[in-house]
Amino acid sequence: MTATITDINAHEILDSRANPTLEVRVTLSSQAYGCAAVPSGASTGEREAVELRDNDLERYGGKGVLQAVENVNGPIRDALLGQDPRSQEEIDRIMIELDGTENKANLGANAILGVSLAVAYAAANNADLPLYRYLGGDGGPFSMPVPMMNIINGGAHATNNLDFQEFMIVPVGAPTFAEALRYGAEVFHALKKRLVSRGLMSAVGDEGGFAPDLPNNEAAFELILEAIEDANYVPGKDIYLALDAASSELYQNGRYDFENNQLTSEEMIDRLTEWTKKYPVISIEDGLSENDWAGWKLLTERLENKVQLVGDDIFVTNPDILEKGIKKNIANAILVKLNQIGTLTETLATVGLAKSNKYGVIISHRSGETEDTTIADLAVATDARQIKTGSLCRSDRVAKYNRLLQIERELNDQAPYAGKEAFLFNRK
């Protein structure tokens, strides 16, 4: 007998920034159930699906999500009772139609996503499968993703003087995911020692990376290279560098406010190009603003065969916007964030579109996270080959890494570590 949805319940919980978010539980007639919690971003793309907040300044500074909870426990629950949880596309379609807007502004993308993911977990649990096998099929193909580890935070993720948001290490040369995690942890500790020895702040930002004040953004690269060598690894062989410029946050009146200079798109591209020549940079995310499509085209023409160019704010995990970008030859990879689009079905469609056009895929967390580990399973299920889930501290980040360790043990030889094969920019 087919199990059907018998109950859906949402409630407020706290995310890693002490802001409310939703946790949703979907229960089936078989008594199997699934739970999921929804993340939240700090630097958000203008075209992201709408995260519904209460705006009641008497509660949580206006950031409560009681209305989104009510939407789950009321109209969404009523619409989905009796549905087969295996019918993910149909369930997501029902919620999208019930909302009735292009950006999920009525019910809230946070409400819809929580239900969408909890339904998938319920179906997986009912089939006695881990989520990655339920979504990816029993035979895969599976691979363990290369982690992009954010070890120096700046921009909107910290209160320091760095313009760029994330300076990351990418342990491409490791033989397994477990070893990649070890490489990253050892560099993290080496970097902390460097910071302490120089009297620099070793407190961490939203995503667990250190947030020191430095003379300039380039000094972050220099510090990280020193830490890599201190940990006895070789930059550009064992470990590469990656950057999230989050340039939409710097873009005003057609210029980029960078290190107290007002740079044109061409000047920003020149700066990024110079760094790719000077440092072992393998990936640049949001090198230009989401509203600077002409600049993005120039950036792609300049660097598409030399480095991974990741579109986050410009694509917002939206398959329609990604398709437009592919046609215009914008970027060569996409950052995938579940809550930017708001359903599992649309997320999987975006991943499929990217992969069919040889765009790199990086499954990503948000700066406001919970202990939910969905993105770890999603990265393996979709054979995305890259994951971005923060630094090597803070339980909200480490939970994803530990889940990936568990998956690697379960799959063993079925899921080789992607390594350099994860990067498609020189094979398009």
Swiss-Prot record:
Catalysed reaction equations from the record: (2R)-2-phosphoglycerate = phosphoenolpyruvate + H2O
Pfam families: Enolase_C, Enolase_N
Enzyme Commission number(s) of this protein: 4.2.1.11
The keyword Cytoplasm belongs to this UniProt entry's keyword annotation: yes
Domain of life, source organism: Bacteria
Compartmental location: Cytoplasm; Secreted; Cell surface
PROSITE patterns: ENOLASE (PS00164)
Sequence positions that bind (2R)-2-phosphoglycerate: Q165, K337, R366, S367, K388
SMART domains assigned: Enolase_C (SM01192), Enolase_N (SM01193)
CDD domains given in the database record: enolase
Binding site for Mg(2+): D244, E285, D312
Cofactor note: Binds a second Mg(2+) ion via substrate during catalysis.
Family to which this protein belongs: Belongs to the enolase family.
Entry function: Catalyzes the reversible conversion of 2-phosphoglycerate (2-PG) into phosphoenolpyruvate (PEP). It is essential for the degradation of carbohydrates via glycolysis.
Subunit structure: Homodimer. Component of the RNA degradosome, a multiprotein complex involved in RNA processing and mRNA degradation.
Name assigned to this protein: Enolase
